[in-house]
């Protein structure tokens, strides 16, 4: 089912992302850049692992992982996290844990678009991507 996510995706819409970044403790200057940047996300499968590359003018990141296995990740805003990504039905669920905190990123395909729902506490942001 990961195959449905394997593509190059371009951000087309973002809702409540500034509030989400603020809740995470992201500084003002970084939030300003984050709010105007339109990242490209490339999801692929390479040798039994899933690879998610995020490219933008601010910073490029890459994570490579096995579904369901914990791995260490440095987030785009420089948090050192223990992460697990698993497939739950047609959703790719990414859980990041750091300093006793936890955030969830749920990716799903709806009408040919990738909808990403980011949750930290009671703050929810939604970002929509279309195939590039």
Curated annotation (Swiss-Prot):
GO BP terms, alphabetized: cell proliferation in forebrain; epithelial cell proliferation; fatty acid transport; neurogenesis; prepulse inhibition; startle response
GO CC list: cell periphery; cell projection; cell-cell junction; cytosol; neuronal cell body; nucleus
Annotated domain remarks: Forms a beta-barrel structure that accommodates hydrophobic ligands in its interior.
Localization per Swiss-Prot or TrEMBL: Cytoplasm
Chain ranges passing through the membrane: none
Role of this protein: B-FABP could be involved in the transport of a so far unknown hydrophobic ligand with potential morphogenic activity during CNS development. It is required for the establishment of the radial glial fiber system in developing brain, a system that is necessary for the migration of immature neurons to establish cortical layers.
Binding site for a fatty acid: 127-129
MF-aspect GO terms: fatty acid binding
Presence of keyword Transcription: no
Family under the similarity heading: Belongs to the calycin superfamily. Fatty-acid binding protein (FABP) family.
Known tissue expression: Expressed in brain and other neural tissues.
InterPro entries the record matches: Calycin (IPR012674), Fatty_acid-bd (IPR000463), ILBP (IPR031259), Lipocln_cytosolic_FA-bd_dom (IPR000566)
Protein keywords: Acetylation, Cytoplasm, Lipid-binding, Transport
Source species: Rattus norvegicus (Rat)
Domain of life: Eukaryota
Protein name, entry field: Fatty acid-binding protein, brain
UniProt modified residues of type N-acetylvaline: 2
